A protein has these predicted regions:
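Bacterial N-terminal signal peptides that target proteins for export
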Residues: 1-7
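Acidic/His-rich structured neighborhood in mature extracellular/periplasmic domains
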Residues: 86-248, 252-255
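C-terminal motif of bacterial Sec signal peptides marking the signal peptidase cleavage site
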Residues: 14-17
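N-terminal mature-domain "stem" immediately C-terminal to a signal peptide or N-terminal signal-anchor/transmembrane
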Residues: 19-87
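Hydrophobic helical h-region of N-terminal Sec-dependent signal peptides
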Residues: 8-12
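Short, well-ordered helical secondary-structure segments
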Residues: 5, 25, 29, 76, ...
Length: 255
């Protein structure tokens, strides 16, 4: 499935609809999305002597994906696998980060509703797009998005708000502005679209990559209700104004 033909055709349809302002209301219906709380299950398992066995039974595919993506462990059947997880999250700062993430995302009902509407919209425009099983995990500020054959998970510890104290030590301000709960739905959708329609252009040509990501962000903005592109980028207004004032210089540097 080639990204250029599919996304270009979709964009042309969007731009032709309602004089360039397509409706974000989907007539296509999907099963309501229920986020699988792997994050909660793992935290509970860490406090139980036989929690590893229960977690393997409840989330085998997600545990495998998590082990490979976060811990670089390929087999969940390794007898030391869960001990490695337990040791990883025993570090006090990481343990507090985990607890804070769970507290922030106790109720995900609104997020589930947003994702249900957004995926229904995407499914209507891109019929071949698979709707994934959606999970949450806590990576310890490492692997943000985990993607399997039919599985998508986001690391919620990276969406605790721009002022979360620990972020100051690891992320610059321009990155922290996107580490908010408001960015979660956008990054779920972008992560899945990028996995479903991977970039097939020339990685050495920045402009090709920009066009690719711009197409995806435009589609995501429409799926989330027609927000302007700057919202999906999550940059503050002062950054947007600077870009507008220096647009010619920016393009000169890029091209």
């Amino acid at each position: 499935m080639r990204i250029k033909g599919i996304l270009t055709g979709t964009l042309l349809f969007f731009m032709a609809s309602c004089e360039g302002h397509p409706s974000a209301t989907a007539s296509f219906h999907i099963e309501p999305i229920r986020i699988q709380r792997f994050d909660q299950a793992l935290f509970k398992a860490l406090e139980s002597a036989d929690g590893g066995l229960e977690l393997r039974q409840q989330y085998p595919a997600m545990l495998q994906l998590f082990g490979m993506g976060v811990l670089n462990r390929r087999s969940i059947d390794d007898e030391l696998f869960f001990e490695r997880i337990r040791s990883y999250y025993a570090e006090p700062t990481l343990h507090k980060l985990y607890a804070d993430a769970l507290h922030q995302y106790v109720d995900v009902t609104e997020l589930e509703q947003q994702l249900t509407k957004a995926f229904a919209f995407l499914k209507e425009q891109l019929p071949d797009l698979q709707v994934p099983v959606i999970c949450m995990h806590v990576s310890g500020l490492s692997q943000n998005v985990l993607v399997g054959d039919s599985l998508l998970s986001l690391s919620i510890d990276k969406y605790l708000g721009v002022d979360y104290p620990l972020y100051d030590n690891y992320f610059p301000p321009v990155q922290r502005v996107r580490m908010t709960p408001q960015q979660v739905s956008t990054d779920y959708l972008l992560g899945w679209l990028m996995a479903s329609y991977p970039f097939d252009g020339n990685e050495s040509v920045l402009l090709e990559r920009m066009i690719y990501e711009g197409k995806l962000r435009y589609i995501v903005s429409q799926a989330l209700g027609g927000k302007e592109g700057v919202d999906t980028l999550a940059y503050p207004e002062v950054v947007e104004q600077w870009c507008e004032q220096h647009e010619a210089d920016m393009w000169q540097q890029i091209i």
